[in-house]
């Protein structure tokens, strides 16, 4: 009695939010107007002629070093999605089998992770502009792996689990705020759509495949494998991410305090 929660209000709420979001996009986002403003701004700054020249020349392909960085970045994307989505997908079963949690009480930890990500997005963006995207992503991958390792150490649920999952959210924000901009940074403006599709192909493929692979381990080896599985893919993501040499963005730092005031008229 009372062990099976009613999920209907949750699904209804999500559906309502999605409909509201769709209506906002339909009626408040004027894509044609924004495109016209962008073109006018490009003409004002003399950018549009440069883009036409590039397109007429056939659109230069990515150089070998940039292409190599892009490939490693895309594999990193796949690996950290393999780690994160394995845990979020199977955590309910893990919490039930390993910790004896019932009645949807496991949802609190996942909610804390979402809150951790939500409160971190803006600070992470600020920190990334100061220290660079790659460093913040590597920090996020390490924090994610350590958090999953800490989750593996818990033999029963307690308040510290919420702290760990809050850190999972912070780590996930550190990764996601910076990964897609790095992909965009490597491509030309006319190729953004193509590379966006490639980025989401890798991320979605990982999200589809990881429940199958992690589920096999859970079923044939044991539920204890969930967090070690995630840690292994975090380690793989860290290795591939260290091989990325392009797509980062850091502001130029003046060599001296006086140079900070050296601005052309």
Model regions and ranges:
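A membrane-interface helix-boundary motif in multi-pass transporters
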Residues: 1-16, 216-234
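C-terminal membrane-cytosol helix-exit motif in multi-pass small-molecule transporters
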Residues: 15-38, 237-245
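Juxtamembrane intracellular "pre-TM" segments in multi-pass secondary transporters
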Residues: 31-74, 257-265
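Short amphipathic helix-loop junctions that connect adjacent transmembrane helices
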Residues: 89-105
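Loop-to-transmembrane helix entry/capping segments in MFS-fold secondary transporters
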Residues: 103-104, 187-199
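Helix-to-loop junctions at the C-terminal end of transmembrane segments
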Residues: 119-133, 218
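C-terminal ends and interior cores of transmembrane alpha-helices
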Residues: 142-156
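Intracellular juxtamembrane helix-capping segments at the cytosolic ends
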Residues: 174-188
């Amino acid at each position: 009695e009372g062990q099976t929660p009613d999920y209907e209000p949750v699904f209804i709420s999500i559906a309502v939010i999605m409909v509201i979001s769709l209506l906002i996009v339909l009626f408040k986002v004027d894509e044609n107007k924004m495109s016209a403003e962008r073109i006018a701004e490009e003409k004002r700054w003399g950018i549009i002629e440069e883009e036409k020249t590039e397109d007429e020349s056939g659109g230069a392909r990515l150089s070998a070093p940039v292409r190599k960085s892009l490939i490693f970045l895309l594999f990193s994307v796949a690996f950290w999605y393999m780690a994160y989505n394995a845990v979020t997908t199977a955590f309910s079963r893990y919490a039930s089998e390993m910790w004896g949690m019932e009645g949807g009480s496991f949802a609190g930890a996942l909610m804390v992770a979402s809150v951790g990500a939500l409160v971190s997005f803006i600070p992470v963006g600020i920190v990334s502009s100061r220290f660079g995207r790659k460093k913040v992503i590597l920090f996020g991958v390490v924090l994610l792996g350590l958090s999953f390792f800490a989750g593996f150490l818990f033999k029963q649920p307690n308040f510290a689990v919420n702290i760990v999952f809050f850190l999972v959210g912070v780590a996930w924000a550190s990764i996601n705020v910076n990964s897609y901009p790095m992909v965009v940074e490597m491509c030309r403006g006319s190729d953004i759509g193509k590379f966006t599709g490639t980025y989401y192909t890798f991320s979605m493929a990982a999200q589809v495949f990881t429940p199958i692979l992690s589920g096999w381990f859970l079923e044939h080896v044991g539920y204890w494998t969930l967090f070690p599985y995630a840690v292994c893919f975090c380690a793989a993501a860290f290795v591939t991410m260290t091989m990325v040499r392009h797509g980062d963005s850091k502001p130029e730092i003046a060599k001296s305090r006086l140079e900070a005031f050296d601005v052309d008229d």
